């Protein structure tokens, strides 16, 4: 680990009161949003965790923005912040825009479709404090983790894709494509700025860059549940595209 990153780590440990910003990019999540917000509120408040949720809404045609506004009235503007964008502008830009509205010193990235249960967030925080690390990522591929709602084909393709990416890129984590993660805010900003990938490979490059820069990453086993409402966007074409993008990342990453 570089001297700079070691000094960064020691300065972060001096913070006595942490606040966690949860960034939720949304597109057509009308049914899921009220449930995930309720779960976040329930799980974090019972652990006395200081938090806020930033909903980054990409002009959903199903009324997701209106639902978000109703939730803001229920939970309050201090807990629920809304950023309305003109359309789908990419995951990286959604995270960066969410960071700009955040007031926390730590940022949690997760999906709004109920694939990621907020009950794991306290475990992420506990792991971070135990290791004093800059990043914690959820993993489906360690003991205690798993996937529910996927057929055998999808499980196998996910495993194979992760294995190929791990062999080529040696990122030091067991679940490269997961998007349920805790970052120190300044670290997240730096990684996103350097990230050149799109789609599912965006998450892969985040871990590869983190490893290159000497950041420590903790892992917490999670159970991933396929979305209840709405349609999953993953298909065989995207899997092929993912593998091509991983190869491109391997050839070009500096």
Swiss-Prot record:
Record-listed GDP-alpha-D-mannose binding positions: 25, 27, 29, 56, 58, 111-113, 140, 227
An annotated GO BP: protein mannosylation
InterPro entries cross-referenced by the UniProt entry: DPM1-like, Glyco_trans_2-like, Nucleotide-diphossugar_trans
Major site of localization recorded for this protein: endoplasmic reticulum
Compartment annotation: Endoplasmic reticulum
Residue numbers binding Mg(2+): 113
Broad class of enzyme this protein falls into: transferase
Gene Ontology cellular component list: endoplasmic reticulum; endoplasmic reticulum membrane
Disulfide bonds: none
Swiss-Prot/TrEMBL keywords: Endoplasmic reticulum, Glycosyltransferase, Magnesium, Manganese, Metal-binding, Transferase
Described purpose of this protein according to its UniProt entry: Transfers mannose from GDP-mannose to dolichol monophosphate to form dolichol phosphate mannose (Dol-P-Man) which is the mannosyl donor in pathways leading to N-glycosylation, glycosyl phosphatidylinositol membrane anchoring, and O-mannosylation of proteins; catalytic subunit of the dolichol-phosphate mannose (DPM) synthase complex.
Homology family: Belongs to the glycosyltransferase 2 family.
Protein's recorded name: Dolichol-phosphate mannosyltransferase subunit 1
């Amino acid at each position: 680990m570089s001297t700079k990153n070691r000094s960064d780590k020691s300065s972060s440990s001096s913070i006595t009161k942490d606040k966690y910003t949860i960034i939720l990019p949304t597109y057509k999540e009308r049914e899921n949003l009220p449930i995930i917000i309720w779960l976040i509120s329930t799980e974090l408040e019972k652990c006395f965790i200081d938090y806020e949720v930033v909903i980054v809404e990409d002009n959903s045609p199903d009324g997701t923005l209106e639902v978000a506004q109703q939730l803001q009235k229920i939970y309050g503007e201090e807990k629920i912040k809304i950023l309305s964008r003109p359309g789908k502008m990419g995951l990286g830009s959604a995270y960066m825009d969410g960071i700009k509205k955040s007031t926390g010193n730590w940022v949690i990235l997760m999906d709004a479709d109920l694939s990621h249960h907020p009950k794991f967030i306290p475990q992420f925080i506990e792991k971070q404090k135990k290791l004093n690390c800059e990043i914690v990522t959820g993993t489906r591929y360690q003991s205690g983790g798993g996937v529910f709602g996927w057929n055998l084909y999808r499980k196998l393709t996910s495993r194979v894709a992760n294995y190929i990416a791990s062999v080529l890129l040696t990122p030091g984590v067991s679940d490269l494509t997961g998007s349920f993660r805790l970052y120190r805010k300044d670290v997240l900003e730096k990684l996103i700025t350097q990230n050149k990938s799109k789609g599912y490979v965006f998450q892969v490059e985040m871990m590869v860059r983190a490893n290159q820069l000497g950041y420590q990453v903790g892992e917490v086993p999670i159970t991933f549940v396929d979305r209840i409402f709405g349609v999953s966007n993953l298909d065989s074409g995207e899997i092929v595209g993912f593998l091509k993008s991983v190869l491109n990342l391997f050839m070009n990453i500096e």
